[in-house]
Amino acid sequence: MYEGGTAVEHFESEHYIFHYGENTKAAEDISHIADYQEHCFRYICSVLGVCPDFKLEYFLCSTPEEVGRIYGDNDPCNGFAAPPDKIYAVYNEQVTCIGFHEDAHIISYLVDRPDPPAIREGLAMYFDRKWWGIQNLDWTGFYLKTGRYVPTDKLLDRTFFFEHDCAITYPIMGAFTDWLISSFGQEKYMQLYRQQDIAAGMVQVYGKEPAELNQAFADYVGLFSIDPVLEQRMAELLNEASTDKSS
């Protein structure tokens, strides 16, 4: 049962099974949600060259608290992937946690599951392309310009990665992943994704130390200017997020 004893409804598409509460926003939009996810699914599989032989199960919840209760750990969350096949996500009038991100996690684990969260989140953000509606590359350029940029080689450390705000680390790693793929090719990136030691794998696959790759990436990002109006909007979004966390 969902919140308030709401009955659970189900909807099945070619590659998904959706669960959601009766008379919720998810129930109202379920046909659109299923169609949207099917398009995301096909693109991810096309890029990664793999396709699950099972259906992905989506648990669409009205609140972060409901996500925690349905999953069973009672830890409020907007969305996350629970391998091998489940995704829990908030879907309401204000928050719609659907799209590429969690599906990319589940599907990419058919290739491998590299240890650094930065690499896994970077690939998911590569598919997302945007954070808060703004391109990963623009965020990375903004962070570089304002002194907030965090080096990608440092982010390979799990502890260091989680010490920093995901609003900074996720777009940076998404843009870095995009740069690796566009610079060296998809095949080499998939070779890297399969490495047990990512730092050593960068040397093996790309012939460069992680710090060298970071510097080349930062130099590339620095080639692009950002519209002042967009910079102002990014500053506003970061300030709003900071205010929400402190309230």
Where are these regions (language model features)?
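Acidic/His/Gly-enriched intrinsically disordered linker/tail segments
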Residues: 67, 72-83, 87-94, 110-246
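Juxtacatalytic substrate-recognition/specificity segment
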Residues: 5-116, 134, 198-205
